[in-house]
Amino acid sequence: MTQYKLDYPFAIAFKPQHMGNVLAETLGTQGVNQVHVAETEKYAHVTFFFNGGVEKVFPLETRDESQDLVPSNKSVPTYDKAPEMSAAGVAKQVCKRVKEQKFEFIMNNFAPPDMVGHTGVYEAAIVGVEATDKGIGEIYETCKQENYLLFITSDHGYVVSYKPLHPCWFYSASVAG
């Protein structure tokens, strides 16, 4: 439908929108050091998508995939089999980055509420949300100790519009989902 890659060999129905002055770009031009942390399943969300759908590293945006790209568990067929995903590793890396005191802006994405929610396995979704909650708690405590402001938001997460036992691998138009 739209052109996500320049080398697609088929007709495009909708040209991609150009997003100018995205937050990462604005922070960089204002002299704000930044880093983005996520596990493999959501790393594109804190880089490519957050940066307006472009493969670009903006000024003062640190990308160290050896540290800030936390490996997702690839040993399971679906994430209801390991619903914590890598929430603990993401939280640990965010806390490490906060303690370094090098970045005025640190963002992350926790995958379990979305990825586990899509499986339709209610008990697993609870475990995934609990792992995320624990990670947020650790980040909160570290931010408090290091005098950082913590701002929590969400773009979506399938678990909020949950229907147990009904796997859903698409995104709804619901504000909740």
Task: Show which residues each predicted segment covers.
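Feature captures the catalytic ectodomains and active-site-proximal regions of enzymes
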Residues: 1-177
